[in-house]
A protein has these predicted regions:
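Detector for small/aliphatic-rich hydrophobic stretches
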Residues: 2-5, 16-93, 113, 117-118
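Cys/His/Pro-rich metal-binding microdomains
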Residues: 11, 25-28, 247
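Conserved lysine of the Walker
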Residues: 103
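Residues immediately C-terminal
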Residues: 175, 217, 255
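Phosphate-binding/switch region of NTP-binding enzymes
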Residues: 199-251
């Protein structure tokens, strides 16, 4: 039997507390705690998550292979430019934007246009048939792009381990859940756990991962604020109010690979 545990999570930063608190001791936000039910079985970690991850070992500085200069061409000059010349292998990139702004279309374009790269597009919001129809409208073909409609993190990690793609797109982080937790997809604990697992996989295997995140009414990315600190790059996708409504603007809000950081 799994041991059921109730906990309270801050919606702003993801801080966990055993009881409700009026003010978060981590970020200082008031009235931000929500109760979630977590079910964990003692000592149980799904093999699909724990198995494929290589174990890192300490290395001397002189023995570490330099790869910072290597960037992958995504086949889209504008996206490459925003990312500083291409995508760094093993990076976790968060793409945020309003509903309907075109996050899924942009991410599918990237997956299809990345010639020479094996890509995996994971959708928790559309069927394979719907994605194929959208790909047809985009008009870009890529035989190395795999489509996988799934929401269970353990299954997603297993498919990534099996196919070993260079690039993975997760659409969206709010629809993904892990069996390690009993809370619903999109909850603070689920978003934090899934993002942390994807980050660990990206760093240990060199697989680059794009995750799409929805934004709230106030313009911030839905989920705990810690999500933006877990990822390597935060891209904001929005409309250009000064130009045509069909024009979209991509902004790099944060990047570990920026020369200014």
């Amino acid at each position: 039997m799994a041991k059921v545990k109730k906990a309270f999570f801050c919606k702003n930063c993801g801080f966990e507390a055993p009881k409700w608190l009026g003010r978060c001791p981590s970020c200082g936000e008031w009235n931000s705690f929500t109760e979630e039910i977590i079910a964990r079985e003692s000592g149980s970690v799904p093999a699909t998550v724990a198995g494929p991850l290589p174990v890192a070992k300490p290395q001397r500085v002189r023995d570490i292979r330099e790869s910072e200069h290597i960037r992958l061409d995504l086949g889209n000059p504008e996206v490459n430019r925003v990312l500083g010349g291409g995508m760094v292998p093993g990076s976790l990139i968060l793409v945020g934007g309003e509903p309907g702004i075109g996050k899924s279309t942009l991410s599918l374009q990237i997956a299809l246009a990345a010639n020479g790269l094996k890509t995996l597009y994971v959708s928790g919001e559309e069927s394979a048939e719907q994605i194929k129809m959208r790909a047809g409208r985009i008009g870009i073909g890529n035989d190395e792009c795999l489509i996988y409609p799934e929401t269970l993190l353990e299954n997603i990690v297993a498919q990534i381990a099996e196919h070993q793609p260079d690039l993975v797109v997760i659409d969206s982080i709010q629809t993904i859940y892990t069996d390690l937790l009993d809370s619903s997809a999109g909850s603070v604990s689920q978003i934090r756990e899934c993002a942390a697992t994807l980050l660990k996989y990206a760093k240990s295997t060199g697989t680059s991962i794009f995750i799409i995140g929805h934004i709230t009414k106030d313009g911030s990315i839905a989920g705990p604020k810690i999500l933006e600190h877990i990822v390597d790059v935060v891209l904001q996708f929005e409309g250009d109010s000064n130009r045509s409504e069909e024009r979209r603007v991509g902004k790099e809000c944060r990047s570990r690979w920026s020369p200014y950081h």
